[in-house]
């Protein structure tokens, strides 16, 4: 079967493209906002209950009932009885709350692979293993945890990141399969009306808002037969075999795309997003920019438009460029006429960009260069408009 592309495996847009569904979402928005606030209050009580009660069948049933009030419905089916002696549960990854949902129906815990240890990690329901600096340290900590008697099974997500679950699974990482020779696979599907279940690149806080905003989200868990390692089977081959079993249960393709490929694709797509279109420039703004361009031909129009957007004044913009308040990459000025006399050559010639070739240009001080640039701009302004604003008032005051 042909391997699907990463784009088809990820959810990149949250809102529906169907106009009818979009209208329904807009009509539902006020009710959803009220529902979010109510569920946020109830969710605080659910969190307190999960903290106070010990892990037991009664606690899991109570949390499932309270979670249904939050709009999270969990159903599970077994192809055969679950072998509860297994210490490793393997599942595909759909949302940021998969570990919390599955723990409602089975005693298990999921290690904090990407979440920093602390209160937030504990509050999200992850198993804290201390500060982990490398994958080797993580595996050593998990092996130590599994060696302790009476511990809950580990729920691991070999995909290491979420997909939309419609076309394919990310390549299973091999490190979870090095922890045990027997694993218990399960497949997870998630459904939700109106909007996408999870959008790539969004934080868990954003996903929590939409989880409480939407009327309901249905999680369906399917227990699959336990899988044992074959003689002389490597961790990589073991992972590929379990990936095939889970993908067949979901009706999708087991791909070779890794979590690193997914992260790179999301990053690249984010950089390639088109910039928002700017508002069309008014005729007055264009005329003002042209005046500045005639006085300072070496300044690019993009820099002129940008500064005029802040100042709204031709004289102020010219002053900003002359005094160096606005940085820009100068354009090459085209020569339109013969060179002027030697008396005006020092003022009229454009300043060299970069390292000057003539010795006299290299010995010019910064103040001299600014004065030359100012005189050149003033002369061109006088030739174009007849007078420089502000000088007429000074002459009138002297008279």
From Swiss-Prot:
Coarse class of the protein's main subcellular location: endoplasmic reticulum
User: Topology with regard to the membrane?
Assistant: Peripheral membrane protein
Q: Which GO terms describe its cellular component?
A: endoplasmic reticulum membrane; lipid droplet
Molecular function (Gene Ontology), one example: ubiquitin binding
Q: Where is the CUE domain?
A: 284-326
Where does the chain enter the bilayer but not traverse it? 22-42
Q: Where is this region: Disordered?
A: 332-364
Q: Which Gene3D superfamilies match?
A: DNA helicase RuvA subunit, C-terminal domain (1.10.8.10)
Q: Where in the cell is it found?
A: Endoplasmic reticulum membrane; Lipid droplet
InterPro entries (UniProt xref): AUP1_CUE, CUE, Plipid/glycerol_acylTrfase
> Its GO biological process terms?
ERAD pathway; lipid droplet formation; lipid droplet organization; protein localization to lipid droplet
The cross-references to SMART domains, in alphabetical order and at most eight, read: CUE, PlsC
Q: Which PANTHER family match?
A: ANCIENT UBIQUITOUS PROTEIN (PTHR15486), LIPID DROPLET-REGULATING VLDL ASSEMBLY FACTOR AUP1 (PTHR15486:SF96)
**Protein name from the UniProt record:** Lipid droplet-regulating VLDL assembly factor AUP1
Could you tell me the gene encoding this protein? Answer: aup1
């Amino acid at each position: 079967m042909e391997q699907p592309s990463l784009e088809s495996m990820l959810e990149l847009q949250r809102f529906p493209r169907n106009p009818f569904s979009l209208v329904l979402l807009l009509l539902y928005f006020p009710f959803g906002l009220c529902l979010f606030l109510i569920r946020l209050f109830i969710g605080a009580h659910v969190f307190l209950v999960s903290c106070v009660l010990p892990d037991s069948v009664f606690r899991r049933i109570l949390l499932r009932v309270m979670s249904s009030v939050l709009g999270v419905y969990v159903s599970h089916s077994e192809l055969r009885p679950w072998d509860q002696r297994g210490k490793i549960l393997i599942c595909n990854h759909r949302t940021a709350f998969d570990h919390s949902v599955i723990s409602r129906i089975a005693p298990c815990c999921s290690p904090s692979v990407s979440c920093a240890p602390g209160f937030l990690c504990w509050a999200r329901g992850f198993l804290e293993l201390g500060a982990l600096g490398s994958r080797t340290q993580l595996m050593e900590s998990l092996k130590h945890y599994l060696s302790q008697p009476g511990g809950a099974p580990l729920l691991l997500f070999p995909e290491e990141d979420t997909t939309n679950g419609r076309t394919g699974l990310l390549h299973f990482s091999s490190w979870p399969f090095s922890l045990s020779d027997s694993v218990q696979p399960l497949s997870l599907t998630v459904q939700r009306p109106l909007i996408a279940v999870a959008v790539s690149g969004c934080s868990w806080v954003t996903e929590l808002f939409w989880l409480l905003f939407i009327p309901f989200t249905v999680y369906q868990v399917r227990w699959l037969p336990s899988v044992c390692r074959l003689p002389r089977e490597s961790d990589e081959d073991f992972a590929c075999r379990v990936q095939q079993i889970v993908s067949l249960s979901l009706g999708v393709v087991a791909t070779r795309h890794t979590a690193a490929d997914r992260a790179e694709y999301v990053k690249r797509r984010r950089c390639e997003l088109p910039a928002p279109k700017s508002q069309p420039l008014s005729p007055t703004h264009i005329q003002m920019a042209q005046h500045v361009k005639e006085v300072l031909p070496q300044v690019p129009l993009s820099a002129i438009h940008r500064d005029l957007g802040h100042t709204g004044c031709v004289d102020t913009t010219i002053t900003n460029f002359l005094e160096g308040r606005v940085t820009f990459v100068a354009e090459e000025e085209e020569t339109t006429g013969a060179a002027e006399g030697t008396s005006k050559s020092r003022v009229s010639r454009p300043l060299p960009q970069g390292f000057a070739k003539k010795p006299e240009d290299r010995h010019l001080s910064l103040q001299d260069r600014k004065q030359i640039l100012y005189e050149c701009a003033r002369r061109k302004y006088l030739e174009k408009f007849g007078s420089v604003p502000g000088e007429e008032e000074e002459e009138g005051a002297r008279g």
